[in-house]
Swiss-Prot record:
<dbReference type="Pfam" id="PF13393">
    <property type="entry name" value="tRNA-synt_His"/>
</dbReference>
<dbReference type="InterPro" id="IPR045864">
    <property type="entry name" value="aa-tRNA-synth_II/BPL/LPL"/>
</dbReference>
<protein>
    <recommendedName>
        <fullName>Histidine--tRNA ligase</fullName>
        <ecNumber>6.1.1.21</ecNumber>
    </recommendedName>
</protein>
<dbReference type="InterPro" id="IPR004516">
    <property type="entry name" value="HisRS/HisZ"/>
</dbReference>
<dbReference type="GO" id="GO:0004821">
    <property type="term" value="F:histidine-tRNA ligase activity"/>
</dbReference>
<dbReference type="GO" id="GO:0005524">
    <property type="term" value="F:ATP binding"/>
</dbReference>
<keyword id="KW-0648">Protein biosynthesis</keyword>
<dbReference type="InterPro" id="IPR033656">
    <property type="entry name" value="HisRS_anticodon"/>
</dbReference>
<dbReference type="InterPro" id="IPR004154">
    <property type="entry name" value="Anticodon-bd"/>
</dbReference>
<dbReference type="InterPro" id="IPR036621">
    <property type="entry name" value="Anticodon-bd_dom_sf"/>
</dbReference>
<keyword id="KW-0547">Nucleotide-binding</keyword>
<dbReference type="InterPro" id="IPR006195">
    <property type="entry name" value="aa-tRNA-synth_II"/>
</dbReference>
<keyword id="KW-0030">Aminoacyl-tRNA synthetase</keyword>
<dbReference type="InterPro" id="IPR041715">
    <property type="entry name" value="HisRS-like_core"/>
</dbReference>
<comment type="similarity">
    <text>Belongs to the class-II aminoacyl-tRNA synthetase family.</text>
</comment>
<dbReference type="GO" id="GO:0006427">
    <property type="term" value="P:histidyl-tRNA aminoacylation"/>
</dbReference>
<keyword id="KW-0963">Cytoplasm</keyword>
Length: 424
């Protein structure tokens, strides 16, 4: 007997029971994006490896340890995308979308990182990202945060997420701060774990978000990034905070909040939750005003975020018991007797013509009437439409409300109007 082939570790199948809630959540997310005037862009999941090395940074964990990279048959190094921003910027430059233009874009799809699989963290995971180009002010930063807050309210999770903000300033300001931070860490090497020692010279800002409690205690006495910010970054951040205050969006300024990707500057933010255990970040982003130029385009202000859909689904399921997923089927057509099967098929087609949004399923699996009713229940149908030999001959249909058991016999021509009333 042949050995079963199973899914790759950390890359999951999502079965119909799972995808129903995913589709419902995605529908809400897309509706809000549309309401803010954002347009979808679709990029390939494979890009040239140098794109991510240049954009994300050679000494980041993502590039050093987590990318799925391979050579194709021509010897070109390719990588499964670990995030979406770099590919979105590449597409914008390549197709002229960013030349003296304002763009509000969003994308959704799988990303890939070689990480240790655990709840909410997988090797293939899905992100929804939004990116805005051509707008330099704090007002667009605020809009992105307001957009995400509207998502949380629509999904019933707003009370279970908290917004954390920081400004990491300009590249020059960070260079000055980096020197001061490294000098401080060198004086306390004995407190640092191996991971922090490795990062101390290659990417010292990442020490700030170490999970080691001893390191966190040490950092209480470390130089503060806010003391090194350039004046423009200070004004930008103050403007953002003022806008959020006016919009009644609560937030916490977290001076140790830095992002794991090198392209960020000025505003960085995260929405975090305590309802998912260790994997607490649901959505994160910030400004990356230098990335377009870094990847070969003209200098273009930019800001965006990405959200992990697996974590979002887990959070909705954990805290919102009232979140409703629409039934798979509205009406189920049951048939019995000579000629009833073909009549059932034609009835279903005519109802789809009359009611395009109706979700209707026809029984093609045979079985007696009782078994067909069991199938209707399995699919969550609200109405059963029954056709026997006598109904076919009389061009009638028995319509049964499966919620209260009431039924009536109608002419086939009247069924669509009745269903619209029952299911509307």
């Amino acid at each position: 007997m042949a050995k079963n082939i199973q899914a790759i570790r950390g890359m999951n199948d999502y079965l119909p029971a799972d995808t129903a809630i995913w589709q419902r959540i995605e529908s809400i997310l897309k509706q809000v994006l549309s309401g803010y005037g954002y347009s979808e862009i679709r990029m390939p999941i494979v890009e040239q490896t140098p794109l991510f090395k240049r954009a994300i940074g050679e000494v980041t964990d993502v590039v050093e340890k987590e990318m799925y990279t391979f050579d194709d048959r021509n010897g070109e190094s390719l990588t499964l995308r670990p995030e979406g921003t770099a590919g979105c910027v590449r597409a914008g430059i390549e197709h002229g979308l960013l030349y003296n233009q304002e763009q509000r874009l969003w994308y959704i799809g799988p990303m890939f990182r070689y990480e240790r699989p655990q709840k909410g963290r997988y090797r293939q995971f899905h992100q929804l990202g939004a990116e805005v180009f051509g707008l330099p002010g704090p007002d667009i930063d605020a809009e992105l945060i307001l957009l995400t807050a509207r998502w949380w309210r629509a999904l019933g999770i707003f009370e279970h997420v908290k917004l954390e903000l920081n400004s990491i300033g300009s590249l020059a300001a960070r260079a000055d701060y980096r020197e001061a931070l490294v000098a401080f860490l060198e004086q306390h090497v004995e407190v640092l774990d191996e991971d922090c020692k490795r990062r101390m010279y290659s990417n010292p800002l990442r020490v700030l978000d170490s999970k080691n409690p001893d390191v966190q205690q040490l950092l209480d006495d470390a130089p503060k990034l806010s003391d090194y910010l350039d004046e423009e970054s200070k004004q930008h951040f103050a403007g953002l905070c003022e806008l959020l205050d006016k919009a009644s969006i609560p937030y916490t300024v977290n001076e140790r909040l830095v992002r794991g990707l090198d392209y960020y500057n000025r505003t960085v933010f995260e929405w975090v939750t305590h309802s998912l255990g260790a994997q607490g970040t649901v959505c994160a982003g910030g400004r990356y005003d230098g990335l377009v130029e870094q990847l070969g385009g003209r200098a273009t202000p930019a800001v965006g975020f990405a959200m992990g859909l697996e974590r979002l689904v887990l959070l909705v399921q954990a805290v919102n018991a009232d979140f409703q997923v629409p039934a798979t089927v509205d009406a189920y057509v049951i048939s019995s007797g000579e000629g009833a099967q073909s009549a059932a098929m034609l009835l279903a087609e005519s109802l789809r013509d009359a009611l395009p949004t109706l979700k209707i399923m026809t029984n093609y699996g045979g079985g007696n009437v009782k078994k067909q009713f069991t199938r209707a229940d399995k699919w969550g149908a609200r109405v059963a439409l029954m056709l026997g030999e006598s109904e076919v001959a009389a061009q009638q249909v028995v319509v049964k409300d499966l919620r209260n058991g009431e039924q009536e016999t109608l002419a086939q021509a009247d069924v669509a109007a009745r269903l619209a009333l029952m299911l509307g």
